[in-house]
Amino acid sequence: MIIASANDYREAARRRVPPFMFHYADGGSFSERTLARNVSDLADLALRQRVLKDMSQLNTEIELFGEKLAMPIVLAPVGALGMYARRGEVQAAQAAENKGLPFTLSTVSVCPIEEVTPAIKRPMWYQLYVLKDRGFMKSVLERAKAAGCSTLVFTVDMPTPGARYRDLHSGMSGKYKEIRRVLQAMTHPRWAWDVGINGKPHTLGNVSGYTGKSVGLDDYAVWLADNFDPSISWKDLEWIRDFWDGPMVIKGILDVEDAKDAVRFGADGIVVSNHGGRQLDGALSSAKALPSIADAVKGEIKILADSGIRNGLDVVRMIALGADATLIGRAFVYALSAAGRAGVENMLDIFRKEMHVAMTLTSNARISDINRDALVDLTKI
């Protein structure tokens, strides 16, 4: 099929990977209303076209936490990437590095830290959940430091897992999930060969390295559910702040007061995020939450945003709303699923071209030039 956008990669991914894996990435929680609003609320923001400005020196580069980024995009932490393409975390990290961007490794990755970092020269970011097993948290932080990871992304919006009904329908969870997955793999032979056979081991590499025993896909949801800590508070994060030498980013902020707490805590950055609509259905979209948060803490802390970004125009919209940079998740997972590293690299090229068009036609030659004057809220016209 012809690939022209992230939406095309979504369709290509739907065809290539088994339903239980596709819908795990594609779906949200409960009725998926927040998942839908993440996209629609961005689409409701028209870009204000301005003309006859000199755009010959247009530049998408930024600096973030001492790193140069070719554009204000970071590949977000996504669990089990190695189930979408053979050793998927390695391929995604290499694609990001080749395009001048950071890659964030998830706590629940298939490939462990020690497999991904030797495959790239650029320091990657590492994502950590709040878990009951503090021994695991300390161990994996030590491993991340030893491997040269530059930035810690601390996810705080999962004290309990969201109810993802689509997973019950797809075979990711629920009754007879094992046999359903086998049958699905049989009808997706390219995935079965590339990932199912040649992509082994299918374990949570970072977790298995700590426990000393294999923690596989069937153990994934159980391990997470058993280890999420609903008692967590800001005080519990203090030892992590003291232990980690580099920048620390708090991911999962949707409220102004929480953003202010992050500043008081001493975080270097926040991610305005509703976990891609995968946690609290009914929560604000990131596009709706971002402006008030930016008004409250911009300049005191770096603001990143995710959830709902499907193209380069959406990146420009998030920057205009007050973000310093963005994270993208589903868009690169679709591309990775469809075409591996080459797919992710091509998708990032598409995003860059879309950003160039948007910046040129809104007369913003630098990322720092973009502000809310570039937007028109269609719901208020």
From Swiss-Prot:
**Entry keyword annotation includes DNA-binding:** no
Where in or outside the cell it occurs: the entry states:
Cell inner membrane
Cite the binding residues for substrate.
24, 129, 164, 278
**A Gene Ontology molecular function term of the record:** FMN binding
Q: Indicate which residues the UniProt annotation says bind FMN.
A: 106, 127, 155, 251, 306-330
Q: Which residues form the FMN hydroxy acid dehydrogenase domain?
A: 1-380
Cofactor(s) it depends on:
FMN
Catalysis: reaction(s)? (S)-lactate + A = pyruvate + AH2
One Gene Ontology term from the biological process aspect of the record: lactate metabolic process
The record's Pfam families line, in alphabetical order, gives: FMN_dh
Q: Known EC number(s)?
A: 1.1.-.-
In the bilayer, the protein is annotated as: Peripheral membrane protein
The entry's keywords: Cell inner membrane, Cell membrane, Flavoprotein, FMN, Membrane, Oxidoreductase
Question: What InterPro entries does the annotation carry?
Answer: Aldolase_TIM, Alpha-hydoxy_acid_DH_FMN, FMN-dep_DH, FMN_HAD, FMN_hydac_DH_AS, LldD
Q: What's this chain's function?
A: Catalyzes the conversion of L-lactate to pyruvate. Is coupled to the respiratory chain.
Q: Which family does it belong to?
A: Belongs to the FMN-dependent alpha-hydroxy acid dehydrogenase family.
Entry-linked HAMAP family:
L_lact_dehydr
Name of the featured protein: L-lactate dehydrogenase
Q: Which organism is it from?
A: Haemophilus ducreyi (strain 35000HP / ATCC 700724)
Gene encoding this chain?
Answer: lldD
